[in-house]
Amino acid sequence: MRRAALALALSVALAGCGLDVQSADLFLLTRSGQGKQLTLLVNDSGTIRCNGGKVRPLSDPLLLQARDLASTLDADVVSKLRFATSANSVFTYAVRLPDGTLRFPDTAGAHHTEIAQAEQFALQAAQQACGLSG
């Protein structure tokens, strides 16, 4: 009986310690090409780091979109989806995920919905969460 009470007290004490457990990064998106390079480090806790700056909050809709993108794009990495470079592209994207990195030109979104969604996420996150022009 005494051991059970001690175990219970210990587990309650540990639960209240506020262990500093950090959420995993969902992905690192880099956009390069004309204009300034953009980097977005998206964390599962609902934060984003823009161009190596300070951590900023990410809105719930953007966080849900980022989680969905991470899952979808990671499946593309696993299936070894590749894109040819295009002379018509303005930007090139690289998305680093747990299973590897997916690289694509901005023209790839015309044929792949998830790629168009990644490009849209980059624009919305840059404007809304980072306060950048996009």
Predicted regions and their residues:
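Post-signal-peptide N-terminal segment of Sec-exported extracytoplasmic proteins
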Residues: 37-64
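Short, well-ordered, aromatic-rich surface patches in folded extracellular/luminal domains
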Residues: 18-28, 77-134
